[in-house]
Curated annotation (Swiss-Prot):
Biological classification of the source: Bacteria, Pseudomonadati, Campylobacterota, Epsilonproteobacteria, Campylobacterales
SUPFAM superfamilies assigned to the protein according to its UniProt record, in alphabetical order: Aspartate/glutamate racemase
Pfam families: Asp_Glu_race (PF01177)
Annotated binding of substrate, by residue: D7, S8, Y39, G40, N71, T72, T182, H183
Name the record gives this protein: Glutamate racemase
Organism: Helicobacter pylori (strain Shi470)
Amino acid sequence: MKIGVFDSGVGGFSVLKSLLKAQLFDEIIYYGDSARVPYGTKDPTTIKQFGLEALDFFKPHKIELLIVACNTASALALEEMQKHSKIPIVGVIGPSILAIKQQVKDKNAPILVLGTKATIQSNAYDNALKQQGYLNVSHLATSLFVPLIEENILEGELLETCMRYYFTPLEILPEVVILGCTHFPLIAHQIEGYFMEHFALSTPPLLIHSGDAIVEYLQQKYALKKNACAFPKVEFHASGDVVWLEKQAKEWLKL
């Protein structure tokens, strides 16, 4: 089975990593709209247009399924993309909510949603969680993480300063943290470490990772089995510098 993975840049590598590990598919076409990253600071109309243009990119590749590996596009463009597509299109928000439903039984557990400004303002996660009965939901736009990750700044003083800026004002310590941008799993270990060190937690918060969640969702939805295929063939494309994108992929995914 040949599928497509669409992201605003390199954040979708976190989803791609989970897909490669699961070996559910034969071939994966990855498209990063790196010339227009970040999506999280742009308006909904623009993001919808970017999503439709991504569909145009994938048409000649004859994929059978498209994964929108971008929370901002999933929140604001997914429905419009589905209207204009003959193949199934899966976003990352629904699978993440399903993962929480399966793993978090306490409806009063404090849940923190991290995301870009556009994702947070869409209320996509807040509304979906409330529909499932989760009552203690807060959110935080952490958009500065995206350019740091795009620049491969995954640790060090600059990232620490950024986390301190965002997390110090928190009044309620979360038991669950939704990494509501596919860039964020690339610094998941650092986020977990920050909470453990600065808030003196005995156990780390549960981190919900879009990549792992979407693998579980695809297995259930399409009756796919892990390791059913050989290691997938991966082809990279970008609206910007594809050589740079491939270099980042080789470093982060160990290809």
